[in-house]
Amino acid sequence: MGQKVNPVGLRVGVIRDWESKWYAEKDYADLLHEDIKIREYIENRLKDASVSKIEIERAANRVNITISTAKPGMVIGKGGSEVEALRKALNELTGKRVHINIFEVKQADLDAKLVAENIARQLENRISFRRAMKQAIQRTMRAGAQGIKTQVSGRLGGADIARAEHYSEGTVPLHTLRADIDYGTAEADTTYGKLGVKIWIYRGEVLPTKGKNKKEGGN
């Protein structure tokens, strides 16, 4: 039975960039665990702010964090109060100087993580999984996607036996590395247990840019 690789990880270094941008030798494991702690803390604290992606860069004793969100106002707060409180909390968590940048996601319906979280919230509010998936597909295709595939798995509708249901529209070429496919997951906590949501969105082809400054020839 064919198994699916994470479409984002497969494209890192081809058309996608790393979400943690730093280099380390001996303390690699410590910094990796610190990254995980930072991501978990931000995701828990900003769980209602539609956070799509958290990028972490390091330089000496400084950590630069870029938060991509569909609701920048909620993250920044009145007069920047929320983002300042978050920065202080992360300073204490890491023991390093933390700088936070906020990046606005203009089209939330083309972001797989945000679409998955939206479906998960609807499932928690007892909306039918079929209706939630079909509405998400319609919104994403209207936003300009070339294809979308959705999957919800678990005790659907309170059934005794867990199963997975898929809906898709358009094309999602998982094998084409130049295809810009966004992948996102979310979990819904229902009275019958957890439901898993997976979303694949095909946003068109991206041609890898070749280095313009590379010298050609023997010299």
Swiss-Prot record:
Signal peptide: none annotated. GO terms for molecular function: mRNA binding; rRNA binding; structural constituent of ribosome. CDD domains: KH-II_30S_S3. The keyword ATP-binding does not apply. Keywords: Ribonucleoprotein, Ribosomal protein, RNA-binding, rRNA-binding. Residues 38-106 form the KH type-2 domain. GO terms for cellular component: cytosolic small ribosomal subunit. It comes from the Bacteria. GO terms for biological process: translation. InterPro entries: KH_dom, KH_dom-like_a/b, KH_dom_type_2, KH_sf_prok-type, Ribosomal_S3_C_sf, Ribosomal_uS3_bac-typ, Ribosomal_uS3_C, Ribosomal_uS3_CS. Belongs to the universal ribosomal protein uS3 family. Binds the lower part of the 30S subunit head. Binds mRNA in the 70S ribosome, positioning it for translation. PANTHER family: 30S/40S RIBOSOMAL PROTEIN S3 (PTHR11760), SMALL RIBOSOMAL SUBUNIT PROTEIN US3C (PTHR11760:SF19). Part of the 30S ribosomal subunit. Forms a tight complex with proteins S10 and S14. This is Small ribosomal subunit protein uS3. It comes from Halalkalibacterium halodurans (strain ATCC BAA-125 / DSM 18197 / FERM 7344 / JCM 9153 / C-125). The gene is rpsC.
